[in-house]
Amino acid sequence: MKNRNRMIVNCVTASLMYYWSLPALAEQSSSEIKIVRDEYGMPHIYANDTWHLFYGYGYVVAQDRLFQMEMARRSTQGTVAEVLGKDFVKFDKDIRRNYWPDAIRAQIAALSPEDMSILQGYADGMNAWIDKVNTNPETLLPKQFNTFGFTPKRWEPFDVAMIFVGTMANRFSDSTSEIDNLALLTALKDKYGVSQGMAVFNQLKWLVNPSAPTTIAVQESNYPLKFNQQNSQTAALLPRYDLPAPMLDRPAKGADGALLALTAGKNRETIAAQFAQGGANGLAGYPTTSNMWVIGKSKAQDAKAIMVNGPQFGWYAPAYTYGIGLHGAGYDVTGNTPFAYPGLVFGHNGVISWGSTAGFGDDVDIFAERLSAEKPGYYLHNGKWVKMLSREETITVKNGQAETFTVWRTVHGNILQTDQTTQTAYAKSRAWDGKEVASLLAWTHQMKAKNWQEWTQQAAKQALTINWYYADVNGNIGYVHTGAYPDRQSGHDPRLPVPGTGKWDWKGLLPFEMNPKVYNPQSGYIANWNNSPQKDYPASDLFAFLWGGADRVTEIDRLLEQKPRLTADQAWDVIRQTSRQDLNLRLFLPTLQAATSGLTQSDPRRQLVETLTRWDGINLLNDDGKTWQQPGSAILNVWLTSMLKRTVVAAVPMPFDKWYSASGYETTQDGPTGSLNISVGAKILYEAVQGDKSPIPQAVDLFAGKPQQEVVLAALEDTWETLSKRYGNNVSNWKTPAMALTFRANNFFGVPQAAAEETRHQAEYQNRGTENDMIVFSPTTSDRPVLAWDVVAPGQSGFIAPDGTVDKHYEDQLKMYENFGRKSLWLTKQDVEAHKESQEVLHVQR
């Protein structure tokens, strides 16, 4: 197999190269950029100023991931139809309706020269490699461009910023289901009456649950703002919502993750069916990512601090994240980052380390704008009819007619939905609006921080709802729930839209001092799996996302608390244990045991529960690579599905009942598209089976007047009938299908980022990070102040030559990932030199 890096060095820059000695590195000229790749193809960039450093970064990204990045750019800006045709017109329209390009450009124009050098240098580096590709496409043009029939376009700073805006801000900090919630509330009021309907809504979508596990322990602090969902004043002010719920209009995807391009009616049917089967974990679900544990000096063994991160973005080919080392201009860092952002989301600089998980704070509100019946395009605000902002957008369509449409915007934000029957337009207001580029650069600048104070200064500038984590060489650890959050009016129910007439406009933004944070917690560790950051902190408004007594973070807490101290290897092994852990066994086994305790030993329902009792909840593959060694998850899947049908689903009017029917286990033949979580229906059911122990008022009896035991046993009877017909009467012989894991060739938007044949599979689904990394400070087993590892599957590269030759680093981390392995991350010049596979030297004048 050809080594593309060696090919590049020999064919493109041989005249620029000379032997790299360490003294020469220190004395390199201001125009020089050195690119050194390690044995896994991960590049380290050396330059003396910011522009040259990020020029080198953009240059290597283009070498490795040019097609992936081209499709990410088109996906985030809504220009996919231009190269892939009419099936992507609706997708492009949806993308363009969701952002305001002039606002992003204005932020870029306001940057300091130093910060502008980051984006400009990166774009210039991308373009430099594209220019070389254009001079030698027979060798250097990635095959995917020929497969799909177009060529790469040049980059500008706007494109670099929009990759971040579209894949981080708009994916992980833009989720809202307030209009969906209003549709649900409308149906609940029709079924139960106004007062009781609101009470049932509170049972299904509570705002705060005091029993929810928190990343910051109660003894450390509680969230100071109190929310009373019984004091909602805005619900009564809203019009009915009888249109289809907006969640049904999200573009449907197939099992391969590709957009299906369906008619509106068929799309809604597909989304409803997919969500009913897979819930938030499935094809029609929402991101439910990621996990992290940080162990400080009082709990780490043979080290002062250990950080293990597992961001769960989903699995893709090429890899979702990109490994890079940056050295010079005040930077000295190593790690990896999604879509090759110019700021490392996961990494360290030899003194501190950092990582992230999605925060799921509520930083987005929907304002119901009252439209003028006489003046189209006008809405009522502060007693006056105000003209909306608008812009015309034209979608260029490959082999088709261009389509022009209008994007509308009010003082609150872009218009997402219009209900002509009530003369209402729904505008999305983001607390981070206007702070997108500053948020990106906060990630970039944190790479220079050397202590908690410097690091939190950047955390304060990061406006998206993202959890940030910290560790340092002295064994200090910390956590901040970053983001900008609205200071809402009293009586504003953040789960629902509010009138946009002016009275309910935000008072401003809450100060950063209000953000949940902790430094060196008493427990000696920090753990998160997208759970609540702090007691009394309000959850996201997403109907599919709840913080309650049932939470998967308990699986991490339990493992960390089992040992007084953990070594680095033990901390890494938590990945293996949690990735195979059934998430419902711990929650419902006591209920099942209580219900069957009076049954005879021969009763098959008791046999099912005894099988669960003997099981540790860990799913392991049989030798056939297709089935589980234990049938526990299959039993829980069928039982939970039956229980939900008899309880939560029965209590919710159609079509919203489909939101709560998924057990959380069902998936496609290719496996889940992302992280597995406890389903929203299961979380609601868990509160119900707790009875008086639950802090959530049970406005409607989910057991419909029957004893809880009777319903549990009936669901167990369903389970036995279903599984015994399928596998026979001997439970010990049941071999139930395992979940697979697929690295899909379509990005999370559903847009191709590779050819279909680049899809990669592994037999075992692992509920773990898309990448995993571990950083260990002051290890006693080494004379280095820090040791670091990661695994970025399938591999560093995404390059396939025009003749079909696959780069040697395309999938050389696939088996490593499957076996819970890891590779070293190098930082020092000596280590990079010792593990050098190839080298390239550029001389570039600015």
Swiss-Prot record:
Propeptide at: 236-289
Metal-binding among the record's keywords?
A: yes
Requisite cofactors: Ca(2+)
Respond yes or no to whether keyword Metal-binding is given for this record: yes
What are the record's GO terms for cellular component? periplasmic space
Q: What class of enzyme is it?
A: hydrolase
Which CDD domains does this entry report, sorted A to Z?
A: Ntn_PGA
Question: Could you name the active-site residues?
Answer: 290 (nucleophile)
Q: Which UniProt keywords apply?
A: Antibiotic resistance, Calcium, Hydrolase, Metal-binding, Periplasm, Signal, Zymogen
Which Cys-Cys disulfides exist here? none
Q: Which GO terms describe its biological process?
A: antibiotic biosynthetic process; response to antibiotic
GO molecular function annotations of the record: metal ion binding; penicillin amidase activity
Question: What does the record's cofactor remark say about binding?
Answer: Binds 1 Ca(2+) ion per dimer.
Signal peptide position in this chain? 1-26
Q: Where in the cell is it found?
A: Periplasm
Using the UniProt record, give the first listed, main subcellular location. Answer: periplasm
Q: Name one Pfam family in it.
A: Penicil_amidase
EC numbers listed for it are: 3.5.1.11
User: What is this protein's record name?
Assistant: Penicillin G acylase
